[in-house]
Design a protein with these regions (language model features):
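Phosphate-handling catalytic cores of nucleic-acid transaction enzymes
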Residues: 1-468
């Protein structure tokens, strides 16, 4: 199977990745404190909150004409009681500065509502334009649009602030939603790229009309059943899966619960300094109505690695004739490139806070980032195809069969001269039609296209005429 070959590339890339003596700050502390069995899970889980601290960086990509942001969509698949709560602790720790800011914005909204409730006058001013960007997975479409419009009104920059969604139990998050995963899938699909727009026009005075720019990073945790429900055939065909980073966490039956090492206080303090510096590159502390300027991060030194990855996987796709490998290698590379850019920016931020003799040389940073890209690219492709590969190949085969059908003849012409209701069902399936026999037969009888022969059999009229 082709995924075994990808797995071979992955193991070499993983070995090189874990040979890195110094990962970027924040990542370093959490990965080093993690037991071996969960290191991959923790590394990728950290990328979602870290992307929020890097929301102002823009990166040119070899195969894109426009700049990219660093949005990432992480889906951790694990059974119940498997230690997923550790991911909650880690992301909460990384997001602490952002959460404090987000909570202060929520407090401004609540204060306005209190003043509005106490005031006898209706003229208390417009509600404040707030920056509430940490959204539950259960947030409605209308509320998402309201949040995006509020951010745009405040900063004058559509999509300038990335939304962040964390869900420790994805299935529970949408249990009360009338649309289930549908709205969530659409939001996640359009928010992967900087140019993504999201909105509605329902013609209701209670709704938000129009579209907004949405950029979002997310970290979802869920059981295999929930994730299979989220990534159904329609969502796979529409591109949700190709945008996702699938992170499976499997433990052997009867294995002990993972035990994390404590992080030294000195490491915690330094990580906080790095996060504070990154936070200050997002929000302008001197002007509450301004974001910090976008920052172009050039990691073109990765281009050779990107081309190498694509060449290796393109050759494999041709060798095994797999459209799944050929399709999913492309966005695997994009997501890995974004992860590499985040790590590169953190390395440079870390160096700014260190004495010269403690700084990591630029050549070493670039070498480390190359290893990070290669590991991430193969991991994303391998995990996606390892879990959903058969489904993807089946979907591709169905699409091929659909396009092979020449629809010059309809159901009537395709049927034999004498046919039954069962024949109608069979031929309808071959032509991908959904018309039931109980509605077709009365119509054809009324229009004198068929005659009933009895015993549940029918004959075409032109066949009767030809036999005379």
């Amino acid at each position: 199977m082709y995924n075994d070959e990808i797995g071979h590339y992955l193991e070499l890339a993983r070995e090189n990745f874990y040979s890195i003596k110094r990962l970027p700050a924040v990542l370093r502390e959490h990965v080093e404190a993690t037991p071996e069995v969960m290191k991959d899970v923790v590394f990728f889980s950290c990328m979602a909150p870290l992307s929020i601290y890097n929301m102002r960086i823009r990166i040119p990509y070899l195969f894109d004409r426009e700049m990219m942001g660093c949005q990432v969509q992480i889906f951790v698949i694990a059974n119940q009681a498997s230690g997923k709560n550790n991911i909650d602790f880690i992301q909460s720790d990384i997001m602490s500065l952002m959460k404090n800011f987000n909570n202060s914005e929520l407090a401004r909204e609540r204060e306005y509502e209190r003043r509005k409730a106490r005031s006898k006058s209706k003229n208390i001013g417009d509600p404040p334009a707030t920056t509430v960007f940490m959204l539950p997975a259960s947030t409605s479409k209308v509320q998402v649009c309201r949040r995006a419009l509020s951010v745009e009104e405040r900063y004058g920059e559509p999509g300038g602030v990335f939304f962040y969604t964390f869900s420790p139990e994805l299935g529970t998050a949408v249990e009360s939603s009338k649309t289930g995963f549908n709205d969530l899938r659409v939001l996640n699909r359009v928010s992967y790229d900087l140019s993504g727009t999201y909105g509605q026009d329902h013609g209701s005075e209670l709704s938000i009309h129009g579209t907004v720019n949405i950029n979002q990073s997310l970290l979802y945790l869920g059981t295999p059943g929930v994730m299979a429900n989220y990534f159904n055939l329609n969502s796979i065909e529409n591109g949700n899966l190709s945008r996702a980073i699938i992170v499976p966490f499997k433990q052997a039956i009867g294995s002990a619960a993972p035990i994390f090492k404590p992080i030294p206080e000195s490491d915690k303090a330094f990580s906080h300094k790095v996060l504070q510096r990154l936070f200050d590159e997002v929000f302008d502390s001197s002007n509450s109505k301004c974001l910090m300027p976008e920052k172009v991060v050039d990691i073109s030194f990765l281009n050779a690695e990107v081309e190498r990855f694509h060449e290796e996987m393109s050759n494999l796709a041709v060798e095994v004739q797999s459209e799944a490998v050929d399709t999913y290698r492309k966005r695997s590379s994009v997501s890995a490139y974004r992860i590499a850019a985040i790590c590169y920016n953190i390395y440079n931020t870390e160096n700014q806070l260190l004495d010269e003799d403690e700084q990591l040389p630029m050549c070493q940073i670039e070498n480390n980032v190359k290893k990070i890209f290669r590991f991430a690219a193969y991991y994303i492709l391998h995990s996606t195809l390892g879990i959903f590969g058969n489904t993807i190949e089946t979907l591709n085969m169905q699409q091929k069969n659909l396009f092979k059908i020449v629809r010059k003849t309809g159901l009537y012409e395709s049927l034999p001269e004498v046919f039954s209701r069962e024949d109608i069902e069979v031929y309808s399936g071959k032509l991908f039609l959904k018309s039931p026999a109980r509605s077709i037969i009365p119509k054809w009888l009324k229009n004198n296209r068929i005659v009933a022969l009895g015993d549940g059999r029918y004959q075409k009229i032109y066949a009767c005429q030809n036999s005379n």
